[in-house]
Amino acid sequence: MKTLIRKFSRTAITVVLVILAFIAIFNAWVYYTESPWTRDARFSADVVAIAPDVSGLITQVNVHDNQLVKKGQVLFIIDQPRYQKALEEAQADVAYYQVLAQEKRQEAGRRNRLGVQAMSREEIDQANNVLQTVLHQLAKAQATRDLAKLDLERTVIRAPADGWVTNLNVYTGEFITRGSTAVALVKQNSFYVLAYMEETKLEGVRPGYRAEITPLGSNKVLKGTVDSVAAGVTNASSTRDDKGMATIDSNLEWVRLAQRVPVRIRLDNQQENIWPAGTTATVVVTGKQDRDESQDSFFRKMAHRLREFG
């Protein structure tokens, strides 16, 4: 009888342990697969594509690749002598038309004072018309001068914000055309994370929720806040034919891949971010509050580590 009880006890204990292990593993698996997290996340930043508004030879390059620059700092200079001459020519035209307008104004005023008693109405109208024509030419010359002044100012290309010069591909002596991108500027303190969350995990993602960001290959955990969730993504399975009818791609009903939706996360401390834009990371949305590691169970800690390195 005792032997039977002993065997039964061992069997019961084994079954209980197996059930507990199964429950623990199942909970860990659910936590790992269904809670809001993703390894498909990337550091991003605001990037300004800097292109000149004038064409000409590059006469001076004042920066080097990956240099940190301040707002207003000169990056490079384009053929100033040519645009200086254009400004001087425009200024001369303005001076000429100012003198001419003064002469025509005096002539028209004299004829208007004398009136039809001294000359015909046609001569008076002609003087007034000539004055108006000269005034229009003066206005055009002034606009040309202002444009030449603006072009001269824009021969000096300055940094629009604090940031890092990257992909610098211009050199002294090269000819650059208006509108062609010369360099990219990664704005300082503009870094954020784009986490591509599966649609099945969006239930636990809300603006204002806290998030943990672990860069690939690093144990350092950065903190952030969910800033926004994208309002839509492209439907790759639906297109239009040449008649405007919808074309829907066939799919397997028992295999449905979850769509990924971009979630923008704002970093708490910009100064601590040393990861370039475009590098990858793991993101875990912890909810309204930061995760308290001291209260995590062993399985949750293991699941969290799997997220980072799995």
Curated annotation (Swiss-Prot):
Q: Name one GO molecular function term.
A: transmembrane transporter activity
Per UniProt, what is the membrane topology?
A: Single-pass membrane protein
Any one GO CC term of this protein is: plasma membrane
The conditions that induce or repress this protein are given as: Positively coregulated with aaeB and aaeX by AaeR.
Q: Which residues cross the membrane?
A: 12-32
Source domain of life is Bacteria
**Protein keywords:** Cell inner membrane, Cell membrane, Membrane, Transmembrane, Transmembrane helix, Transport
Query: Which InterPro entries does UniProt cross-reference here?
Result: CusB-like_dom_1, CusB_D23, MFP_Efflux_Pump, PHBA_efflux_pump_AaeA, RND_pump_MFP
Q: Which family does it belong to?
A: Belongs to the membrane fusion protein (MFP) (TC 8.A.1) family.
Q: Which NCBIfam families match?
A: PRK10559.1 (NF007850), RND_mfp (TIGR01730)
Q: What does this protein do?
A: Forms an efflux pump with AaeB.
Quote the protein name from its UniProt record: p-hydroxybenzoic acid efflux pump subunit AaeA
This protein's species is: Escherichia coli O7:K1 (strain IAI39 / ExPEC)
**Gene from which the chain derives:** aaeA
